[in-house]
């Protein structure tokens, strides 16, 4: 071996793994990296699969953080929740960037393998559905999509019936002494949240006296961050779909771009947006 080809190996580097776990074993890379099964011979289908699988991994982490944050807020541990929610926002920014990679797929390339997808669609992503549930956008009718898998259906049913991030945030307002209407506190949490004047009045007071309600103010801003990022993700999703398939119907049966444009108007924390006008 020539002098300039020598590999410098530090003395402490481990090389014997006969009885020790390797990096690949820890991450179960054999399983992870063998999960990209193309259904066509088209080169670009690999891009399509990897982008969506990577997004699902990020969504798994988002759910991990959201659920932990919800539990922390329930227990009045707001500071740890702030860290978790900040991490969610960082993950969201990462997922948004992935649309730039998928956008390198042209209409001519996608049409070569689109039929291989059958009726499979991102609309069926159960993790995305659970994220919506965790944020308070409850859609009971969507459970029908998951009836094929009883175990998965049960998990989504449980998520539908669990308090959302906004539910526990409103409870935090109550614990601070704000008078929230009983209809809000006793509402059916399996239904989409509807804005309420008493909740808006409470958040308005929080924003009007930040020093007094610093933790609630920080919580509110973390929620706004998450919804802001989610709306940006939805917009990039819509524009990427429009760029690749135009206004064709989605593989899952939706109206495609028209549907994605409509969901841009959905809000998770309406009062937090309203107070910005009223301050």
UniProtKB/Swiss-Prot annotation:
**Organism whose genome encodes this protein:** Bacillus cereus (strain ZK / E33L)
- Identify the enzyme class: oxidoreductase
Q: How is the cofactor bound?
A: Binds 1 heme group per subunit.
Q: According to its UniProt entry, what is the function of this protein?
A: Heme-dependent dioxygenase that catalyzes the oxidative cleavage of the L-tryptophan (L-Trp) pyrrole ring and converts L-tryptophan to N-formyl-L-kynurenine. Catalyzes the oxidative cleavage of the indole moiety.
Query: Which catalysed reactions does the entry list for this protein?
Result: L-tryptophan + O2 = N-formyl-L-kynurenine
HAMAP family the record matches: T23O
> Which family is this sequence assigned to?
Belongs to the tryptophan 2,3-dioxygenase family.
The entry's protein name is: Tryptophan 2,3-dioxygenase
Q: Cite the InterPro entries for this sequence.
A: Trp/Indoleamine_2_3_dOase-like, Trp_2-3-dOase_bac, Trp_2_3_dOase
Q: Give the gene name.
A: kynA
The domain of life for this entry's organism is Bacteria
Q: Does Oxidoreductase appear among the keywords?
A: yes
Q: What is the E.C. number?
A: 1.13.11.11
Question: Subunit structure, briefly?
Answer: Homotetramer.
What are this entry's molecular-function GO terms?
A: heme binding; metal ion binding; tryptophan 2,3-dioxygenase activity
Q: Does the keyword Metal-binding apply?
A: yes
